[in-house]
A protein has these predicted regions:
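Short secondary-structure boundary segments
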Residues: 15, 95, 142-144, 168-170
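Short, flexible loop segments at boundaries between secondary-structure elements
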Residues: 100-101, 163-174
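A C-terminal functional module that forms or caps the active site or interfaces directly
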Residues: 106-129, 133-138, 143-160
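Structural motif
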Residues: 9-10, 70, 137-138
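Short acidic-hydrophobic, aromatic-tinged amphipathic segments that line or gate anion-handling sites
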Residues: 51-58, 175-183
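Anionic-ligand binding region
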Residues: 69-115
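Short acidic active-site motifs
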Residues: 1, 59-60, 79-82, 100-101, ...
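Glycine/small-residue-rich loop that forms an oxyanion/phosphate-binding "nest" at active or ligand-binding sites
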Residues: 2-60
Length: 188
């Protein structure tokens, strides 16, 4: 990361709100190189009234252990181990179409026929089709904001009468696009 910052005077960290490890690495590299660091905050989504919010994937998984119905996991491959104690036939993870994504599914013994390997974000219509095709009753997601297709997932859940479970964003400090652009103008 420090090599990428060579010659830069400012670094804008616009990583996913849940990419805490990447943010830490970027911040440390900026400190090491003396590059000015700014964290861009994505606007949080307005959560639908009937959504269920948990702090962690483990809490969501524990809740889902006592429910019935198929579960679409759109939280990413790194969160899959939290759901390993749920009847695996109920789990339908939507992961990136990479070896790492597939291996993460295999590590918790998800049947290949249940793996949805696609790269998003996804339209409202595609989300609806997936919910209907796999008879999903629960969708677990992170609030990735508009960039992450959160509202399309939420609207598809509403349309298909699927319960929406949201993993709360990590608390962080940051800035708006406007304030970061203003700082960039000052540096010109």
């Amino acid at each position: 990361m420090t090599k990428l910052l060579h010659g830069a005077s400012i670094c804008v960290d616009a990583t996913h709100p849940y990419a805490t490890e990447a943010t830490r690495t970027i911040c440390e590299a900026c400190e090491m190189t003396g590059v000015e660091y700014h964290r861009l905050l994505r606007t949080e989504s307005e959560l639908p009234k009937n959504s269920i919010v948990f702090e962690t994937a483990a809490e969501a998984a524990e809740y889902l252990e006592n429910t019935a119905g198929n579960i679409l996991l759109t939280t990413g491959a790194k969160e899959l181990p939290a759901f390993k104690n749920i009847d695996i036939k109920r789990i339908f993870p939507r992961v990136l179409p990479t070896l790492d994504g597939i291996r993460a599914c295999e590590a918790i013994r998800v049947p290949h026929r249940n793996i949805i390997a696609m790269q998003g974000p996804f339209s409202l219509d595609l989300n609806r089709v997936i919910l209907e095709q796999f008879n999903i009753q629960w969708l677990v997601t992170k609030d990735g904001g508009a960039v992450g297709g959160f509202m399309e997932k939420a609207k598809a859940c509403e349309y298909c009468c699927v319960r929406l479970i949201v993993l709360r964003r990590p608390r962080e400090n940051g800035e708006t696009v406007e304030s970061i652009l203003e700082r960039c103008r000052e540096l010109l």
